[in-house]
């Protein structure tokens, strides 16, 4: 029996992540200047950044049904304490301190959370090898 096209479909790569914003200019400044993300381009009502090969799109919700709190976006960093200190120096409002989430067989998982200029929850994560 031959596999159908639907049997072969697998979502295995994120191409773009959208984050709803109320004030696009303020959000662009925050993601570019405060978080240090690489700005790609802007079109009316939308701005795009590169995040390690995944495109991040900022803009107002296209339709009312899309205007809802989003998922937590986690940025993977090599040194969570150094990144925390650097962003705190840029007045990022952290909700907590870097803390251990889980001990895995070969690494420890650390996280810390903050809100962006639009109130979206963001996180930093670091897998610290032992």
Show where each model-derived region lies.
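N-terminal beta-strand motif that seeds the catalytic metal site of vicinal oxygen chelate
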Residues: 1-25, 55, 71-73, 126-130
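Vicinal oxygen chelate
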Residues: 24, 73-121
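Amphipathic alpha-helical segments
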Residues: 25-38
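Short secondary-structure junctions
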Residues: 36-41, 94-98
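Conserved short beta-strand elements that form part of the metal-binding/catalytic scaffold
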Residues: 38-71, 121-127
